[in-house]
Amino acid sequence: MKTLLKNRELSAFLAILALFGVLVALNPAYLSFQTLGMIFASSQILILLALGAALVMLTRNIDVSVGSTVGLCAIAVGVALNNGYSLPVSMLFALAIGALAGAFNGLLVVGLRIPAIVATLGTLGLYRGAMLLWTGGKWIEGLPSSLKSLSEPVALGVSPLGMAVLFLVLIGAWTLSRTVSGRDFYAVGDNLAAARQLGVAVNRTRMLAFTINGMLAACAGIVFASQIGFVPNQTGSGLEMKAIAACVLGGISLLGGTGTLIGAFLGAFFLTQIDTVLVLFRLPAWWNDFIAGLVLLGVLVLDGRLRQALTRHQRALKYSRFQPGNKGGKHVTPFPKRKKEVA
C-alpha cells in the first residue's frame, strides 16, 4: 500500500499490464511489437498533452485550453507548408505560436492573478475562434509528404516523431527529478509560501510551466497534422480533458506538488489502450469516453481509500508511543473503540 502511494505511477503501470494481460488472453495475436507500436503511435498526441498538463498541475494550476492550442498550431504548420515554407520553418512557426499561447495563459494567471480554470476557459474559446477565423472554417488539406513521412515507422515500429516523444519524456523526467529548476515545480505546488521563503522564483516557474505546456501542445498539433495528413476545423476538441485524466491516472495530484512525467506518460498510454478494447470487442466508438470516465472514477476512489488507510496508519504510529507498554513506539496498539453516543 505504502509503495503504491509513494510511487503513484506504479498503479498506472500495473493497470496497463493487467489490461494487456486480459487482451492477450482474449486474443493471443495482441502480443506483438506491431500492436505495441500501434498503441504508442495512437497515444503520442495525448502523451505530449499529458506532459504539459503535468507541469502545470505540479504548480497547482490547470490549463483547459490546450485542445484549442493543438488545433491552432496544427493549422499554423499546415498553412505555412501550403504557402511554400520549409518543414523546419513551419514547425518552428507552430512552436512559436504554442509558446505565445502558453505564455499568454501564464500572464493571465501569474500576472493578472486570474484563477487558472477561469483564464484558460476564456482562452479555450479565444484560440478556437482564432483558428476558425484564420481558416474561415475550412479544413487544411494537401499537406506535403515531407510532413507525413515523419509519422512512418523506421525502427521497431516507432516513427521519427515517436522517437522525439520518447526523448521528451525521458529528458523531462530527468530534469524534474535531477535538477534544481525541475524541483522548483514541486516546491511551488507543494507550498507556495515556503517556496518563496526558500528563494524559489515562483512566478517564473509558473510562467515556464504554462509556456512549456503551450509548446508541447504545438508539438501535439504537428504530430496530429503528420499522422492524419490534413487538419479539420475541430482539431483538438476535447483533448484537454483527456490530458488531465491521463495525469490523474498517472498519479499527478490536482493539488500540486506530487507526481512524475513517467506517470503522465503511463496514464496517457493506458487511456489509449482502452481504445483497443473497443476494437477488440467491436464496441461503438462512443463507448470510449464512458469507459475512460468509469476507469478514472475507479482509480480516484481507490486512491482516496488508500490515502485514508495510510493516513490512519501513520496517525496510529505517531501516537502509539503515548500508549502504556509501548516504549519504543514501533509496536502499534490500537486505541480502544469508543462507544457510540446516544443522541
Curated annotation (Swiss-Prot):
Subcellular location: Cell inner membrane
Transmembrane segments: 13-33, 38-58, 61-81, 92-112, 114-134, 154-174, 212-232, 251-271, 283-303
Residues covered by region (Disordered): 321-343
Keyword Transmembrane: yes
Source organism superkingdom: Bacteria
Membrane topology of this protein: Multi-pass membrane protein
Single Gene Ontology MF annotation: transmembrane transporter activity
An annotated GO cellular component: plasma membrane
One Pfam family it belongs to: BPD_transp_2
Main localization category: membrane
Keywords per UniProt: Cell inner membrane, Cell membrane, Membrane, Transmembrane, Transmembrane helix, Transport
Record text on subunit structure and interactions: The complex is composed of two ATP-binding proteins (LsrA), two transmembrane proteins (LsrC and LsrD) and a solute-binding protein (LsrB).
Purpose of the protein: Part of the ABC transporter complex LsrABCD involved in autoinducer 2 (AI-2) import. Probably responsible for the translocation of the substrate across the membrane.
Family to which the UniProt record says this protein belongs: Belongs to the binding-protein-dependent transport system permease family. AraH/RbsC subfamily.
Xref: PANTHER family: ABC TRANSPORTER PERMEASE PROTEIN YPHD-RELATED-RELATED, AUTOINDUCER 2 IMPORT SYSTEM PERMEASE PROTEIN LSRC
Identification of the protein by name: Autoinducer 2 import system permease protein LsrC
Organism expressing this protein natively: Enterobacter sp. (strain 638)
Gene from which this protein is expressed: lsrC
